[in-house]
UniProtKB/Swiss-Prot annotation:
Keywords: Viral tail fiber protein, Viral tail protein, Virion. This is Putative tail fiber protein gp36. Pfam families: Gp53-like_C (PF21882), Head_binding (PF09008). It comes from Acyrthosiphon pisum secondary endosymbiont phage 1 (Bacteriophage APSE-1). It is found in: Virion. The keyword Disulfide bond does not apply. InterPro entries: Gp53-like_C (IPR054075), P22_tailspike_N (IPR009093), P22_tailspike_N_sf (IPR036730).
Amino acid sequence: MSKIIPNIVVSMPTQLFTLRRKFQACSNGKIYIGKSNTDPTIPTNQIQVYIENEDGSTVPVAQPIMINHAGFPVYNGQIAKFVTVESHSMAVYDSDGAQQFYFADILKYGPNRFKEQAAQYIAYIEKLKGTTTQTTGDSTTDVMSQKACTDTFAEKNSKEPLKAGRLNLESSNGDTIFNLGGTDGSAGSEFAYVKNSKRTQIYDTATQTTLLFPQKNGTLAVEEDTYTKTEVDAKINSVKWTTNKLENGWMKDPNTGIIIQWGSVYKTDRSRKLFPMAFPNTLAGMGLANFNYDDTLSEMYAPNIMSADKVGFKMRQSLVTDGYKDSPLTDMRWIAIGW
């Protein structure tokens, strides 16, 4: 008698569908099949479903797939085996139209995706035939030397993680570049060893800036790219005070936003005056003084602010001491600060 090797389990080819919260057949329910990670109840997302016959032939069927009273999927009242040719999403609804289950992707890898990745792995194995691995002395550090891999192949296919204590790479164009960007091709940083100039640099492709590491004995100096006069002037101008040097003028600090303004008002002018520049946020305060050219005046006047806001103000002079009243009023000077 020959030795029997059992390797096939006798089981039902059809799946029993039950309710989510209790072990009961999902009677008169419906099954929808669609593209992975989509809503299969939407017709545009649905994919073709087939009935697989005993002889292996298939027959396309329409959706939704009905569930009988016992909980089995049926076609024209007959229990059948339903299949698809690719991974799919599946939604199960009960007889009242309530969703019982939803699966975004039935298979972790669809047949087509597995075929594509298998082809890449085979290509990796073929390229690794030209590699050698050795041990450095008593250390457990491995040295991996790759000479059979072209630049084009390495650029397109080096997405898998590589673990090695030391990695020797030789580039045909003289520059060895490690691209630290995203696997989807998004911009990132490049760590490059420039062979001709004997220096190491890090280049950020997102901001287009370069950090250079020149070779130094004992001390590593990090230097920035040389700026042109135009670039230096632009940096200085971005932080220095701006000003309008007129009789009624202003100056502004770009770092803090503080604004200082000044001006004069004619002797007896009590009309509303506008600041040379309106304060964007607030008027913090004002200082006032008379500008007197004649120290023999027999009358003294003091300037006063009648009203003021971010845009303008009113001011006047008031008599402080009595005298012979034979001297004219003097011009009024003011200074304001705000931001």
